[in-house]
Amino acid sequence: MTELTLQEAIFTVSNLRNQLNKEYAKFDTEYRVPVAVNNESIVNDGKAADVKDSLKKIEQMKHDIITLKAAVHHKNITGKLTIDGAEYTASEVLESLKLERDIVNNLQNNTAFGYHRERIKTVAGVGIVEEGIISEKEVLEYIEALEVKVNRKSMLIDKFNSTEIIEAELKTI
């Protein structure tokens, strides 16, 4: 059994995916070769063994990725975090964090003026037109308050990920 923090497990999954992509690439590069000439095989035993080794590595990495992702998921749905006196699962906090970041980004994009989005324009036949967001001050205050919540939740998740331990039976480590 291997013990890892959630942070280490997430990092390991990322590394395993990179290694998996390298194994996939071998099938497009070094394993994609002429295999027969005039109906006679020209594959050497060494390359055939390399292909078998790659397939074995792929299976081991697949196992480890699934095992780690399942263990992280389990810890996220059972691990608890306290925010403003209320208790939430890490999974709930992660989901709210994802949604709140999306809200902040979308509202910021829609309240920003600049390139191709001028606040003041001269419109022929109308005059000087000023554009803005209705209740802009309220929207900007909402964004600012939500950013504070997002940052606080992010720090709690970082702490959770760096202190919570999972155990997993891994084949590649």
Each language-model region and where it sits:
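Structural preference for solvent-exposed beta-strand-turn elements
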Residues: M1-I173
